[in-house]
Amino acid sequence: MTPKIVLTPEILSSREGVTNKLKDLYSTQIKLLSSKRDAKIPVVNHYVELLEQYEKQNEELHKLNPLDEGLSQESFIELLDNQLSVKVEELAKINSKLSFEDLSNLNAVYSDSIDRFFWDFHTNRITSTYTLKEYIDPEPLMKVHDARSIVEQSIQTTSQILSLNDYPVPKFEIDSIPLKVKCVAPHLIHIMFELFKNSTLPSISRKKPIIVRVTDEDGFVMFEIADRGGGMPDSSLDKIWQFHYTTSKISERDPIHGFGMGLPLCKVFADFNSGKLSMVNHEHFGVSVFLKIPRAFKD
């Protein structure tokens, strides 16, 4: 039997800290979702449907006293773990409700204020998830990694997911110098998966590899993902960073395409890791995407 965790002043203080942080994040999310209650936009309404869930989780935190020594650490972690289980399903819950008509309607009325709503929601969602995981798992999430290792893990993950979904797997070429990067590794792997996935079919159709370059740029690690798949029409460039913009028809959707969350969500993940994501399109030639993440100079 695992011995019961002894409540020390340090543990009680950390419980108070994480509880207060989560209450602030949930309150911000509740305010954000409440501001869109009267929206006449179906996609936004699907987000607003999560309001009750956030109110419930916020109430759970307000009802407990993290400094109460009668509340065991095991019970406290169980509560946070249950909240995490709900939180990681949010995006899937939203996507399961989206129709092609919903996405078309959103595209017709998309604006800066709608973009800001999505950006703030996903930033808060990712921060909440990170805060919960960081407390539950004693292993730090934000740490130093070898940059090339991140690329290789991303290629392996992409190849596995594409194969499992009956997609062809492209060839990759890595041009990397020894560099270390400080990041949440699953976030960078998610970003690279999305970028590799987008380049897969164009690269295969032209029998060209996806090239990944890793270079040093003024204290940052620059990951360049370049393909020679023909590029995109310049006319589509103003849409690609738009949340829920997709060119896929509802009948073409599969587990890895069709929800329009790839690039914009990657940008949120990059921002969370103090980085930036940008793109250069060469119409009729190919696309280069640049992911810039702070360099780590020591472990």
State where each predicted segment sits:
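Short conserved segment of the HATPase_c
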Residues: M232-S248
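Acidic ATP/Mg2+-coordinating residue in the GHKL
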Residues: D227
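Glycine-rich ATP-binding loops of the HATPase_c
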Residues: S274-F285
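Signal-transmission coiled-coils
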Residues: T2-P168
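Short alpha-helical Gxxx[C/S/T] motif in the catalytic ATP-binding
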Residues: G262, C266
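Short beta-strand/loop element within the Bergerat-fold HATPase_c
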Residues: K207-G219
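Short helix-loop "hinge" at the ATP-lid/N-box region of the Bergerat-fold HATPase_c
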Residues: N198-S203
